[in-house]
């Protein structure tokens, strides 16, 4: 019996909507990363992007446990000497709530061209509105 290898042109990709309201950040991010990679599919192949498209709504209502709301720190660097910037979870949630889910999921994806292709299939929105009604996304309960 031969080993099945998925081909990029034959992979069927579905669209899913995930409501992040009241969900824990890490638990929702792991499931999203798993589906972006395609590991939930039978035809999963490590070197082929077999994942689905994921739309996340209500990104501003995601929660964290414990003291992480005040203590979790996100870092970024401008590339210049002394250019390290840091912000806490609550400040980032007030300013850019989409970035919280994006950073959590991106850290769970592989580094390199394949990981970047998987990351591009993630769409995160604040509120309940999104621009992908034409794709007829299915609701995904996590």
Curated annotation (Swiss-Prot):
Statement: the UniProt record of this protein carries the keyword Ribonucleoprotein: yes
UniProt keyword list: Ribonucleoprotein, Ribosomal protein
Alphabetical GO biological process terms: negative regulation of translation; translation
Pfam families: Ribosomal_L13 (PF00572)
Record GO terms (molecular function): mRNA binding; structural constituent of ribosome
PROSITE patterns recorded: RIBOSOMAL_L13
Gene Ontology cellular component list: cytosolic large ribosomal subunit
Highest rank taxon of the organism: Bacteria
UniProt xrefs under SUPFAM superfamilies: Ribosomal protein L13
Entry-linked HAMAP family: Ribosomal_uL13
NCBIfam families attached to this UniProt entry: rplM_bact (TIGR01066)
Similarity remark: Belongs to the universal ribosomal protein uL13 family.
Complex formation: Part of the 50S ribosomal subunit.
Function: This protein is one of the early assembly proteins of the 50S ribosomal subunit, although it is not seen to bind rRNA by itself. It is important during the early stages of 50S assembly.
Protein name as catalogued: Large ribosomal subunit protein uL13
Organism: Pseudoalteromonas translucida (strain TAC 125)
UniProt gene name: rplM
């Amino acid at each position: 019996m031969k080993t099945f290898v998925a081909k990029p042109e034959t992979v069927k990709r579905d669209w899913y909507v995930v409501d992040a309201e009241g969900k824990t950040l890490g638990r929702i991010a792991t499931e999203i990363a798993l589906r972006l990679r395609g590991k939930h599919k039978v035809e999963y192949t490590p070197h082929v992007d077999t994942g689905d498209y994921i739309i996340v709504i209500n990104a501003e209502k995601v929660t964290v446990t414990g003291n992480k709301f005040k203590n979790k720190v996100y870092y970024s660097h401008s590339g210049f000497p002394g250019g390290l910037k840091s912000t806490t979870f609550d400040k980032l949630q007030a300013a850019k709530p989409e970035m919280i889910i994006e950073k959590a999921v991106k850290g769970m994806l592989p580094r390199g061209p394949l990981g970047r292709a998987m990351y591009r299939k993630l769409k995160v929105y604040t509120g309940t509105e999104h621009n992908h009604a034409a794709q007829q996304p299915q609701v995904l309960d996590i």
